[in-house]
């Protein structure tokens, strides 16, 4: 059966020998993993996402990030994603050569992310969401050092694995298990994973569409609200 990300009671009721698929590899998925592996004999866990990326760790006792001006190396609008990624990598290398850390670059950039977003065209925003947002998220939204250490220890066991794969289908079986059809990244053929339960940690659905709340649908039909063209909630003026 499928369990919501925050339904810890249902997770706790799973047998100690259960095999569980966690859909997602972000913070919510890590929380679910920690809950499922609290017992002395942890369950067998597979974490799955398109890229198989896990959140990066914070540093222990980092210096407070400096609050500076808009970085000169970024440039002004209109920005292109390819150019911006190249500039960020150059800045990371420059700071690393002088004893800095990639986290310093992102910390300095954090107050200016709204301005960066506004400087991207609609096509470039969609390109970011399609190709780069997974990499941005794991570096921007980091784990506490203690949580990162616990995650690292779990990944060294044979009980936890992370897959970069696409979920194709899910079928129930006569004995109450689930057959998960997936295709790993870079592979042409699909494979089947048999699990006891699935925990959905994909996060909120920000796109406003036919499956949205009735009130939102009605407001859109009445032209009182406009969905974001990027699928990020509502279109706003700034």
Annotate the PLM regions.
Residues 1-238:
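Flavin (primarily FAD) cofactor-binding/catalytic cores of flavoenzymes
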